[in-house]
Amino acid sequence: GTPESIFGDHPYKQGDYAVIPRGTPYRVVPEGEQRHVVFTSPGLIEIPRRYRNEYGQLLEHAPYYHRDLHAPTELRTHTDRGEHVVKLRIKDGFQTYVLDYHPFDVVGWDGYVYPWTFNIRDFEPITGRIHMPPPSHQTFQGPNFVICSFCPRKLDFDPEAIPIPYHHSNLNSEEMIYYVDGNFSSRKGIEVGSVTLHPSGIPHGPHPGLAEKSIGLTETHEYAVMCDTFHPLRLSALARDLDDPAYAYSWFEAGDGATAHEDPAGVTSHL
């Protein structure tokens, strides 16, 4: 498909992150049926500071290179007149503007803020002798959140390593994972297109039996996108309608006596 904007056309392909700066008039023209995960940020999406030197150049240990970031390719001429509807997002709502000219009708542009794409397959995976924690796969950062990419990679290579995530609690962040493609070895009941949300403070980790099953594995074939936020996430009505109540019980063996509790906010907590 192609995001069109005042900066020109910017084709994307499967696996692309498409970053569109705030204040950019744009529209997305997809080609066929597609599945997207969309993050809306109140500020800039940036390359993590630890990947850059004091001048902003990517360091040699960074998991990608500046040539992996792609700018718009073609600035087309738009001369058509008539009503053109532009939806402007203002905080928690929208305003509608009707222009008598095409919103992308520009002669040219100059500067350093423009849409760009980065493909998840260009992310060089992070590996180690023992298990690397999820934040080591950080790809971007934004105000009060980070984006991480899980890609096919060699697993932990210490002879006594258990090559699967350990049980943990995120005390200061909410963990949302979008499962893009491949085989997800630490989860049961997950398929391509699934989204999981683990709230802060709730212990989670591999499903029963998967740690033992992982022993001897040398590589993983998965693509997933994780968003860790440092403020609590709220479920929308649509998200609640799509919730799979069986997921929270998937850590329990039969007969463990797990129960569900409805809290005053109307969100089901599984105990």
Task: Describe the function of each predicted region.
Residues G1-L271:
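Jelly-roll (double-stranded beta-helix
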